[in-house]
């Protein structure tokens, strides 16, 4: 169906690839690139309560959801930014584990040897991303899943998909609560225990030369709380008297904290050795893969534990919970948490290079709320640097939209449906033919990309701009994304039904409105661009789409209707070409 514009489309993709690699790098910076940005007023002074235009409502929803819909835009226009956020926070959380459990029960009822797996975790993710009413909670939970990373790529984690669904639920449940609670829930979750190896971590044994596993102790500081270096509230590095960055922790801190994370294992009605090890089925609680781990005093270190200036005294009887409380209190109270976590949330939701003033305002809101994630999320989304249209128009503002969010934005904008009702999009990790990214399947604990990633040998790198998502953007993934969207726009997305016996891919998009405009190329381009990009389309993209549409011959319908099929195919091809070219354009790939 796309053959008639293959040459033009190929030319466009080459241009898009080059633009994404170069021009986009300059466009995925932050509003704080110059001195003026640092003076942008905070939320109280500079943010209107109601979007002045539908375009601004659409831009807000691009940051706060998995993609704007007309209904979302209408709601934000009716009640305003802050009220919409409050309304979203009040919505009950959707449960991925409940969906997984229901699917598992259905499969086992049909075949006792069968069970649900990773696919059902991804089905639930996309169902909620595309249809869920708690868009903000799910969007923030997804952002948190890229900070507090567990990955189904790991065989232990991937082999326990019910636990992964429960982990995502846990992030959603804590998305607007206390950071201190969130951090403890992360630390005690069995999936994190498996992933970073503090599940069944044993106390030191000098006689055997055994020391506690330090993996989680290191990462909970480096990645989940305080980072490697001491920070100013603005996120800038604190410098010592020697002019060098000051490290937040030492090897001794890691060793001391590692003792805290000994003696933690599966939850259950007792703390028998067999339950700690999970030796037999009778000692394996059905909920053990998603219920917070419990402490087993017989495996917990008795010795003094020193870290970050705190001390847990030697214990006559090991008390894992008391040790953990001191550790969590110490980490959550560290002044680095606000700027360290806040900056990453800004990067995930709004812009890759926020100004120091923006980061400081978010950190201050977090601190004033006593470590309140709700206050942090509001500050991220309502800050004038996030909402000011002039700032957003700056050449270095915004971020490269990651592949998963490009897909969800498209499918939400077009009201995609699922033939099975399950949204069987599945794993999309292949770089050459798919998105090169699958939710909850990062290659390592460092996520798909690092928050401080600077693309080498680029103009952005020379300018000191960060572009995290560019770490998974290269010639192969650009072509893979284009191929995946080409096939998806033409035929649909995902597998051919739950049993692979359906006649078409499960997730379908209707182009009826676009097909009706196929004989009016400019109107067709306007509709597609308004639906997918709004004002972000600019002025250069429309002529390209119009030219591509015109290049597809649309024959006149013969009086006897004998060529109706050819006419219908041409109209459909024109409509799909317009959509496809918008989806691979740099204007869509960059979130402003």
Say what each PLM segment does.
Residues 2-17:
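Bacterial N-terminal signal peptides that target proteins for export
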Residues 14, 18-22, 26:
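Hydrophobic helical h-region of N-terminal Sec-dependent signal peptides
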Residues 23-48:
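Bacterial Sec-dependent N-terminal signal peptides
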Residues 47-55, 116, 131-138, 211, ...:
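Structural motif
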Residues 51-73:
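Mature N-terminal segment immediately following signal peptide/propeptide cleavage
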Residues 58-65, 106, 110, 148, ...:
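Flexible, low-complexity segments enriched for small/polar residues
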Residues 68-174, 199, 272:
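N-terminal accessory alpha/beta regions
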Residues 77, 89, 107, 118-126, ...:
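Active-site substrate-binding loop specific to GH73 endo-beta-N-acetylglucosaminidase modules
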